[in-house]
Amino acid sequence: METNVKGEKDKELELNEVTMILDVAAGVIEKVRTGEITHITTVLNDDNQNQILENADGALLLTIEELPDTYHGCYLYNGGEFPYAIKGSLEYLVLNDGEGQSLTKIIGVGMEPVKRFRFQGPDEPSVEDPEGDSCIWEIQFEVAPVLEEPRHYLMRWNPSVSSFKEEDYQACLEDMNHGMFRLNWSISEWQEARRGDVFYMLRSGDEKAGIVFSGMFISDPYPADDWAGTTKRRMYVDMVCMNAAAPDEEPFIPLEKLQKAIPAFEWAKGHSGVLLPDSVWQQLSELWEY
């Protein structure tokens, strides 16, 4: 499957096996954009199994040690434990409501058996059975909108003073889901921030200073208690974090390189969650892609 969908401003995203197109009802796209809808569900079947599940030339890969006596295709119940692997390359859903399309980023996947039946062999009719060895699996994609014109923010992290320590970062990397982990983070210039905006995380305060991961906001800003323990309130955003450098590795873009390539911006000092000017984030994105 190949499609071109508008992503960042004036940029065509060429998507093939990393995306899947799903038809949705009218109004769903707008509700995904606002966050009223966060999950898109579909049932696993013979038509979409190769798009959703890891497979080798169409043969589904099972994640269980004990194989069933008969072939169930994508309908194996396995005691209610999902026996397949979600395709690691599947990153996006394109939502189609009949009038337009919208690109969304997959940020989580859930699976649930919704109807059980008894497998009677190839070419034999299936019989619905609450104790059956087969089932229809519902796949729940958690998504966030990929905006055509996202704003770009610089978040800052100093492990020596932050409540988020280096060991917390390591734990996040060891517990990633679908290649991502989640954080909430304070944002100083929050007034224009919205769900779907892009961020870069700048580590500071030590010899590993530089951009260490990127991601997107999956909430609008909201108030909460100060992470530093003061009585004042701060604004925060929820984020999914991707493309992360290990704590013992060099940052993807060292601070010295940032300062040399984009000297007009103050990288070494400042608050977390500052809105980057267009000229700055465009240069930064070129460094990131390079």
Please give the residue ranges for each predicted region.
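Compositionally biased, charged N-terminal/linker segments
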Residues: 2-88, 97, 118-123, 127-195, ...
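Aromatic- and Lys/Arg-enriched surface recognition patch
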Residues: 82-146, 212, 216-280, 289-290
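Short, charged beta-turn/beta-strand-edge "cap" motif at the junction between a beta-strand
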Residues: 98-100, 203-208
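Short, flexible loop/turn elements at secondary-structure junctions
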Residues: 159, 203-205, 219-221
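Eukaryotic short linear interaction motifs
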Residues: 162-164, 208, 223-225
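Polybasic, glycine- and aromatic-enriched phosphate-binding surface used to engage nucleic acids
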Residues: 189-204, 223
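His/acidic/aromatic-lined binding-pocket segments of jelly-roll/cupin-type domains
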Residues: 191, 209, 215
